[in-house]
């Protein structure tokens, strides 16, 4: 890009609205040498200072002087903790995806499911942005579209207090700036393949069968000017396809429609059918085991992943002050999650699909050298589907009985997982921001943002079809339960969100201050039961029989008719509440016999349901940086941070159905009236340069978290119980981070950080209280603060890179951390706790990742041959343990378990490969640049 500015009489100048990246800045003045400064790094929301030592010359045009800029070790306008990772840094790291990069940042950890946690918060408390646009799926708080590492220009992770322009996050902000095209053509293709090389064949089935095609990746990018448009229009395009069979495998010994019988007390009478036997069966367990030894069954990947990601950006520089761009991201992910019980029947497991798309037109207009605005629009669609067969009436679905009858410690010898989930979130966004450097001291930024969501959701369980009399049809035929059933939920909701903010960056000689505030408005556009003791939309307890003339609800609680202008309003004699037709408009009342009451039967003035409340929140924030020397600065930040509830918790169980069972607890409901979750965050930190090449940073932080989502228990008129989400959970996080940044030369760099952190709360999951009371035996929900499930108290990260120019290079990442907590039990299957919740720790975890490359040139092209090794030492890190022993390789349950009614042994059942981290993975590849 070519942008510039004129200085004032003091030589002061500003250049605003530069995209993050690396630049060359040139200063010229009549009577002085021209000075060019190269390798100037520009980062998001940071001020980069470039001074020019001009020397006078006799001639009007003197010799040009070139200076190479060094990235400052101390960023003096830093007022909170953040990490910046540039595209050249990513290229040198042995990393695969965005999560691998995030995990290396101080205060960031990943749990056993791979979810990202920043400074001890829940995984849904992180905001993800691409080019200033949110790509966080509001249903579950996850990333809605994947961005390939090769398409990232700069990544910023804010783990401390963030400015007022950032909202809907409690723990941190991950902001990605994507690449855009330049004035010259640039492209490249990378191909690599690999597999797992591990000695842990006693844990991972068939891991010693090395297949170089088990992992394959191909990606490429191309950028430059669009032909016929000169340098006004440029483009960037990137594509990636990734296919990994995974490291957890099963054996195709049984097919979903196989049916075995293990009911006989004598295993000599068991009838066993596997995939090689067709419709015939072998009688007797030992006879079958002898037969199976003679057969070779197929290996089937059970945690495979396929990804396709596409990225593009078209940039049109209409004038020197006006730029218009359109960016697009598309990702398609197909994966499976390992289910140990299906190890011998892997074809019966469901598949999961994630599809994301975002399109973002952006107009940037510089009104003057000191003021510009951006106008952004975005269309984002995220769809998540989970099923075995897309058609729920697919005849390949079988009776759930074929899984093996649910025998204890037995692998499934047939059957299918019959759950279906399909949800789609569409977001329309408009955003307007203005930035103005009103003087040398103050940079004002303000903005408005509007979002309109549409959420479509449906989930059900494929069940056996029934005839008109309600009898199950034999043989099995798949069917969808009626919408009024407990195992079928469907809804469409259209919430809206609006926000506004203003912030001022005050740069004084003595200090830098970031101060601001934001206002957030959210309307869930949901409905809530008027009376929580009778919430059901499809089957209310207090149904009525108008025709009988009785003045009692179905549960014998009195009501009265209240004539008003000839209408018939129903008034509850106990509460005085008036009721009309329930919402939505297609819902009905029924009488005691189950007959539908039509509109003509009665008219009313009250309401069985009420609309949810809108929420407004104000968040003040301040950050201060105080330079103590020319090589050091102290910073402090304090702020209030709010986040709306995820849609999952707002709208769960939209018909408010209750699974009746004589007072037992079996139902959980959403709550469209949930309040915003709240965090008060403060931190204080020190940046210090030591010598010429070493930087030290120390940060202490504390977070007080309340209004988190939990569950409360409610009893109905019919003495049934149900749970619903409410704002009652709480927690706190405190810790210290120490980081060393060593940069002795351009060839070598090393970064080391250590985090001591304690994350505590009364619950790790919004469902915790619900699950506690449903346990056998039930237990009281936790009210004291205990370590959270992802609490990782000690974390040490090391990132070392060495490159000999562009010839060859090495990279090493080391990670060491204490294990996460678990709750000890006397016996895992009994669920009786032997101590407090999360009172014990899993073993220490250690991992090394390695990368090496060698550059080659021939035929006018540049090539790079590289190798990446993940888990270099093939460590068996435990990510889960048996709660009865705290060990990953032994459970005391095996001492008390009876004979397995199935074809597997107890040892096979209690060998849990899913309890271990990924074994050693080796990838070899080639990059061609042109």
What does each of the following model-derived ranges do?
Residues 64, 374, 378, 627, ...:
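Membrane-embedded beta-barrel scaffold of Gram-negative outer-membrane proteins
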Residues 693, 697-711, 716-825, 927:
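Gram-negative outer-membrane beta-barrel transporters
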Residues 16, 133-160, 202-213, 220, ...:
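Short acidic/polar hinge/loop motifs at secondary-structure boundaries
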Residues 105, 148-188, 219-221, 229:
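A beta-strand signature from Gram-negative outer-membrane beta-barrel systems
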Residues 211-334, 354-370, 620:
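Transmembrane beta-barrel wall of Gram-negative outer-membrane proteins
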Residues 807-811, 815-829, 845-847, 854-930:
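C-terminal beta-signal and adjacent terminal beta-strands/loops
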Residues 1-64, 68, 73:
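Periplasm-facing N-terminal accessory domains of Gram-negative outer-membrane beta-barrel systems
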